[in-house]
Amino acid sequence: MTNKYDHLDRQTLIGLLQRRDAERQLGLVWERDEIEADQALNDDFVALSLDAGLSHGEAPWENLIIEGDNYDALRALRMTHKGAIRCIYIDPPYNTGNKDFVYNDRFVDKTHRFRHSLWLEFMYRRLQLAKELLADDGVIFVSIDDNEIFRLGMLMDRVFGSDRKLACLTWQTDGNFDNQAKIKIAHEYVLAYAKNPEIFPMPAMVDPNVPSTSKLFRSEIRNTIVKNGPKNPVSEIFLPAGFPASFNEGIVHKRNDERWPKIERDICVLNGCLESGVVVRSGWANKDLCQKFIAGGFENIKDSKGQDTRFEITSTGAIENVKVRSASHVISVLRNMGSTQADSSLLVDMDIQFTYPKPVNLIQYLISIASDDKATVLDFFAGSGTTAHAVAKLNAEDGGNRKFILVSSTEATEDTPDKNLCRDVCAERMRRVLGGYTNTKGQSVEGLDGGFAYLRTRRIPKHRLALKLDHAEVWHALQLLHSRPLSHWPSGGFASDGELAYLADFQAAHVEQLYEWLRTCTAGGASVYTWSTERLNGLLGETAAGVSLLPLPHYLRERFGH
């Protein structure tokens, strides 16, 4: 059997080995040159084709379920959603060797020589695309177990940068205590990386295991600024008239005993303020900040962490800084977030067969950490559709308008060519979650409302776009590019949506529709896509002033990239 090195002489081979040894560094290395190429990799354009029959609810649709290889879907989304996704959650195949990782339509088993390299290459290609989709303040969560946690961590560092890591969360699972392992595993991991950690907002969440009586739920944080020690020598602060008090009316008594701070005389408080100025003596923390507060006329100021801060004197004479508490207390151990067993039972009640789904509560919590109530949430290993279920549940609870994008392959293999996980599990679950259903016990379960468009990826050679790309695919790509919900292509030659229009041909009736639409548009705000901008510009004449005329398929090809 020949290989690519057979024709090389001894000295050339030695040179190759020396260069390889010199390049090897501490870190993640996988056999990219030796493994079987991923058949999903291609340079074709990827169109998204709507299947209205498998969609749910009435158009227009804000949520998307995409059937196809996620490498293709991610490239299509890079064209339409680059920099627009606030939160990504994925639960990729765990690569245990137990028929959980499909590569080139075949399961990769434990005996495969390059099992880990195949998995790393597969993930690397997709994570690179995912990074481009994240908004500047976006975050990605990746579930993983012990089999690949260390390799995945190094891979995430390579793709996103080690300085972008927010946390390695540990999710306490129910575990499998029936097996004979010496140590029973009762946890998995969730790696969290931010596009830009410095602008990732403080999570507006308190761990659900914190009791409601905890001080974490108080609206303010109060701490005395008295601090005596070698680094905080005794000094004076003058509190002028008008300095705030923590009570409305009364007397703060002179303090000249062992207590700090020392107060030279009794002070009267009226209407929540000192009636006259007084000198107080102590060692201080935040003395400079307190004096800035005084100099600023007792208006709230920002501390070093950007928190609103004010200062008050209490009835006992203590000086306190008072900070507005943000409801944020996220810890790295995730407990009581549901279980795969409970959510498996939920799917059984829906009459949907799927093993080991992630708990809705877990993903709901992660989304709450990472996004606001208008965020778009992406899952490109959608499985049973738990991420979309979590989004719908959150919206129902807080009235939010989050949107989901799910990507799932059919998971058909050589042995199961008719399998379609996306259609029969993922989309079917969401039809029932949103529309309501009767469970296997005969009980009626109310829907959470909402709908989704069901799309399929379709590869088209870039040089054949003008011939192979149909008008509906163009229209849907343009709607997504302009952050519009998807609607049906009207089967004519013209469609418009807000300030967006697509002229598919130059029939007189369709050009007239364009004229009518332009009369309703804001000056300078209209974008018209056409297959011949030169011809359209000639037809419109002065009407084209202030209108953006964009050429097809060139514009889509350029946005799609490589």
Question: Over which residues does each language-model region extend?
Answer:
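DnaQ-like (DEDDh/DEDDy) 3′-5′ exonuclease domain used for proofreading
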Residues: 1-89, 95-125, 279-285, 296-303, ...
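Segments forming glycine/polar-rich beta-alpha architectures that bind adenosine-containing cofactors
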Residues: 210-349, 358-376, 382-384
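Conserved Class I SAM-dependent methyltransferase catalytic core
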Residues: 116-169, 422-439
